[in-house]
Every structure is written in structure tokens, then in C-alpha cells.
């Protein structure tokens, strides 16, 4: 029997993280915003948690077409130790060509992140980017110059509250 694929393990990790958070997650906040083409760098940012403890900022540049309606959903665990940020186009696939993207967190360190070229819509499933197309650091998910193929429709980030130094 062949070993499970990388996609299988990604799904297992995401499911485990989601189950861990689902046990005690506050109602997420979802905010619509426009992704605007034109090649200019734009940013959209939202805060969540007690005292706006966490911030998720989506910075991008894209080309083609007209504005697209996207959404950013933010949620925290009841103990405010975990944070989720999901950025996506609810209609599924984006028709814009992204020249760059970066989702950056403040107040938390990333435990899991995935980028998708196509978001689930109706009977279609999410289509993840190839791992070489994006990179994940402790606080950001971003395109990998030269490898990113300009398709983005969704970002999912699960993070844990950053430890404060005593």
C-alpha cells in the first residue's frame, strides 16, 4: 500500500486544528472588502479578540478585470489563545492575476496555513497552491517570487497567541 500523499496529511493537520479550535471558538467576524486590480499594492486589515489582541492584514497587487468582492473572517478561541484568519472569494475562483500577496498576523504565531488557487463553491472543492508557490513564516503567508503562478482565491491561517516576554 502506498503512503498517503502530502495532500492527505495537510487535510489531517487542518482537520485536527479545526477540531481543536471548534471545541471553544467564539462566533467569527466576517467582513467584506473589494480586491481591486490595477497593479497597485493594496491592504485590508481587521482586528479581533479582547482589546483587539490579534490583527490580520492582507496585502496584495493584482491585474485584470474589475473589482471582486472578497471576505475576511476572523475568530478566536474562548480563552483567546488561538486565532483564525480566512481570506477568500466566496464565489470560488478569482479571475484576477495576483502579482503578489501576503497575509500577516500581529499578536499570534502561525501553526497552520494554506493558500488556494480556487475556493470551494457549490459542488467544487478547494484547490491548494503547490507548496513551492508560497511560503509560511511565524507571522506571515506570502507568495514565493518566481514560483507563484498568479492564482489566488483563498488563504486559511490558524495561529496561537504569541507569548509575551516577562
From Swiss-Prot:
Alphabetized UniProt keyword annotations: Angiogenesis, Apoptosis, Endoplasmic reticulum, Golgi apparatus, Secreted, Signal
Effect of disrupting the coding gene: Mice show normal postnatal body mass gain, develop normally and are fertile. Show larger infarct collagen-rich scars and more severe heart contractile dysfunction compared to wild-type mice after ischemia and reperfusion (IR) injury.
UniProt keyword Endoplasmic reticulum present: yes
Gene Ontology process terms (BP): angiogenesis; apoptotic process; negative regulation of apoptotic process; positive regulation of angiogenesis; positive regulation of endothelial cell proliferation; positive regulation of MAPK cascade; positive regulation of phosphatidylinositol 3-kinase/protein kinase B signal transduction; positive regulation of protein phosphorylation
Subcellular location: Secreted; Endoplasmic reticulum-Golgi intermediate compartment; Endoplasmic reticulum; Golgi apparatus
Induction of synthesis: Up-regulated by ischemia/hypoxia and reperfusion (IR) injury in the left ventricle (at protein level). Up-regulated during adipocyte differentiation (at protein level).
Span of the signal peptide: 1-24
Coiled-coil intervals, chain numbering: none
Gene Ontology CC, one term: extracellular space
Pfam families with a match to the protein in the record: UPF0556
Chief location: secreted
Expression sites by tissue: Expressed in prostate, spleen and lung, and weakly expressed in the left ventricle (LF) and liver. Expressed predominantly in inflammatory cells, such as monocytes and macrophages, and weakly expressed in neutrophils, T-cells, B-cells, endothelial cells and cardiac myocytes, after myocardial infarction (MI) (at protein level).
InterPro entries listed in its UniProt record: MYDGF
Protein family per UniProt: Belongs to the MYDGF family.
PANTHER family according to UniProt: MYELOID-DERIVED GROWTH FACTOR, MYELOID-DERIVED GROWTH FACTOR MYDGF
Functional description taken from the UniProt entry: Bone marrow-derived monocyte and paracrine-acting protein that promotes cardiac myocyte survival and adaptive angiogenesis for cardiac protection and/or repair after myocardial infarction (MI). Stimulates endothelial cell proliferation through a MAPK1/3-, STAT3- and CCND1-mediated signaling pathway. Inhibits cardiac myocyte apoptosis in a PI3K/AKT-dependent signaling pathway.
Protein name as annotated: Myeloid-derived growth factor
Lineage: Eukaryota, Metazoa, Chordata, Craniata, Vertebrata
Amino acid at each position: 500500500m502506498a503512503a498517503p500523499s502530502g495532500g492527505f496529511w495537510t487535510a489531517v493537520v487542518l482537520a485536527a486544528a479545526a477540531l481543536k479550535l471548534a471545541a471553544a471558538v467564539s462566533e467569527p467576524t466576517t467582513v467584506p472588502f473589494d480586491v481591486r486590480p490595477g497593479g497597485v499594492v493594496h491592504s485590508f486589515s481587521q482586528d479581533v479578540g479582547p482589546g483587539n489582541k490579534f490583527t490580520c492584514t492582507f496585502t496584495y497587487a493584482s491585474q485584470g478585470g474589475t473589482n471582486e468582492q472578497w471576505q475576511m473572517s476572523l475568530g478566536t478561541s474562548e480563552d483567546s489563545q488561538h486565532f483564525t484568519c480566512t481570506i477568500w472569494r466566496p464565489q470560488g475562483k478569482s479571475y484576477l492575476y495576483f502579482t503578489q500577496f501576503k497575509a500577516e498576523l500581529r499578536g499570534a504565531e502561525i501553526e497552520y496555513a494554506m493558500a488556494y488557487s480556487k475556493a470551494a463553491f457549490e459542488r467544487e472543492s478547494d484547490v491548494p497552491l503547490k507548496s513551492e508557490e508560497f511560503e509560511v513564516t511565524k507571522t506571515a503567508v506570502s507568495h514565493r517570487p518566481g514560483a507563484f503562478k498568479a492564482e489566488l482565491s483563498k488563504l486559511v491561517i490558524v495561529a496561537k497567541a504569541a507569548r509575551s516576554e516577562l
